[in-house]
């Protein structure tokens, strides 16, 4: 049995490079999603980053708006490694909020706009989320949940001359958390 190794692929065989690709340690860096966004904004600031319908957002604008969101969330106490719920309709604002949450070092927990409030609350409590970002239209539905709620509209209106910077972010922190319906009917993350 000592010579039998069924659990590890044969990386030394030529066919292994076709299946797994060559090992390239120079590509493994300690970057996080926010670092990649910022690098793209510096490299190609006017390049289109997001398109939704007729709306186009450049990397510069995405980075600027994400900085606004991150600054507001950091000032509100959001820290690296924490989880923030994200309950918005699909669109540019949803993606800007994802980038902003990533810039805090926290993870986002996406919840579809049609998610019932009871299910949303179960997921956020189970994930130990520090709060939820939604839009003004959905905010009234969260009034009696006891959750900390931020709205995208308010987060995007905040103005910071010097963005509040994250610290203590590690590639080991989660970037996002997903919940499924679960076979028991209880959401599982």
Locate each region found by the language model.
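Carrier-protein-dependent adenylate-forming modules in NRPS/ANL systems
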Residues: 1-189
